[in-house]
Amino acid sequence: MDIQDRVRLASLLSEYGALLTGRQREMLAMYVEMDMSLFEVAEECGVTRQAVLDAVRHGAEALQRYEDAVGKVALKDAVLAELDRLTAEDGSLKGKLGAVYEILEG
């Protein structure tokens, strides 16, 4: 998994992580957010590397299904990109839109 995949998965986990099982969420967070290896996660959770791999795969697939159905991350990314474009055109908007940035990035 490359860095872009990890960043994308971290965004999905942030938005939809509560919809996963506790075990999937825990293992996925260790793997993606804490940058632990499958082996390290397995040791920490007291399971096999294969169990972690299965949890990570199924969790990632579930997160993508949620995003495909809801589209919250894509919408947030599109709004942030548009705000960036607008503030690049008119720097004075940056201060006025600061609260919007905080809400979206928060």
Go through the PLM ranges and name each one.
Residues 80-106:
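Helix-turn-helix/homeodomain-like alpha-helical modules used for DNA recognition
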Residues 55-58:
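Residues within the DNA-recognition helix of helix-turn-helix
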Residues 22-34:
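Short amphipathic alpha helix immediately N-terminal
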Residues 41-42:
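Short alpha-helical "recognition helix" segments of helix-turn-helix
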Residues 11-20:
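Short amphipathic alpha-helical boundary/capping segments
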